[in-house]
């Protein structure tokens, strides 16, 4: 069976799309954040590759083409932001302060946990970019000397958790303002969380999209500083 799949140039694309489609079906049917399409697709893909004894490189020969769509997809996040540009102008100080607070909270939390659990410096810097988009996070981790592959995994996990828990956490802490919701989600769980923000509303999606870019820049600068604290 593995020989049949390995001979197909579209193995990665097919498995990825079908598993994600199945995850989307489950989420629509059960209407719960636990059935996150990305999380479901990751689990299905891993199980499939292990069962069919297919190595990652063979899978990635086809799946890499989907990665090429990441940049234009990210650029499309500017559309809801443009549609809410007047709202952004009126609240620019609050927005920037909120994003800065989120970035500092993330970096400080990682530093404190690294001290408590006595992580090595390499392990510590690996976690610093956990809340920003993968493309930026990989560069930060590599520059600081972290484990890039682990950084990617942590970023994905952070995003999935944000996507699943964001709405519930906002309700628990009574965060009702759409701008506050968008900033909180985008700053803490990047593009994956932004998908959830867009489900909540247009304003939430726009503010979350902005937060991805701004928090990415601030985290790059902040990570360099925090990396030299411990």
Placement of each model-derived feature along the sequence:
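Helix-loop-helix hairpins and the membrane-proximal interhelical loops
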Residues: 80-92, 115-116, 139-154, 172, ...
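Juxtamembrane boundary at the C-terminal end of a transmembrane helix
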Residues: 221-230
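Hydrophobic/small/kink-forming positions within alpha-helical transmembrane segments
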Residues: 13, 17-18, 104, 156, ...
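Alpha-helical membrane segments and immediately flanking helix-loop junctions
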Residues: 123-150, 156-157, 172, 176-214
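Short alpha-helical transmembrane interface motifs in multi-pass membrane proteins
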Residues: 7-8, 59-60, 93-95, 121-122, ...
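Transmembrane alpha-helices that form the ion-translocation and gating core
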Residues: 97-133, 158-173
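Small-residue-rich segments of transmembrane alpha-helices in multi-pass membrane proteins
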Residues: 39-51, 71-74, 97-110, 128-138, ...
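Helical membrane-embedded segments and adjacent short helical loop/helix-boundary regions
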Residues: 2-16, 20-82, 87-98, 102
């Amino acid at each position: 069976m593995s020989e049949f799949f390995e001979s197909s140039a579209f193995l990665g694309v097919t498995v990825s799309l079908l598993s994600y489609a199945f995850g989307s079906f489950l989420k629509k049917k059960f209407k719960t954040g636990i059935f996150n399409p990305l999380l479901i697709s990751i689990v299905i893909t891993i199980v499939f590759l292990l069962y069919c004894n297919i190595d990652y490189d063979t899978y990635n020969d086809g799946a890499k083409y989907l990665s090429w769509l990441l940049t234009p997809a990210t650029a499309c996040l500017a559309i809801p932001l443009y549609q809410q540009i007047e709202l952004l102008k009126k609240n620019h100080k609050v927005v920037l302060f909120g994003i800065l607070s989120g970035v500092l909270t993330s970096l400080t939390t990682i530093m404190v946990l690294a001290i408590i659990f006595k992580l090595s410096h390499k392990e510590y810097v690996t976690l610093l970019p956990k809340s920003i988009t993968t493309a930026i996070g990989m560069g930060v981790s590599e520059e600081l000397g972290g484990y890039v592959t682990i950084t990617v995994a942590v970023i994905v996990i952070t995003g999935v958790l944000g996507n699943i828990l964001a709405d519930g956490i906002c309700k628990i802490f009574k965060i009702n303002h759409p701008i506050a919701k968008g900033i909180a989600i985008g700053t803490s769980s990047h593009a994956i969380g932004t998908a959830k923000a867009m489900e909540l509303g247009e304003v939430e999606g726009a503010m979350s999209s902005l937060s991805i870019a701004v928090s990415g820049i601030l985290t790059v600068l902040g990570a360099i500083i925090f990396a030299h604290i411990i």
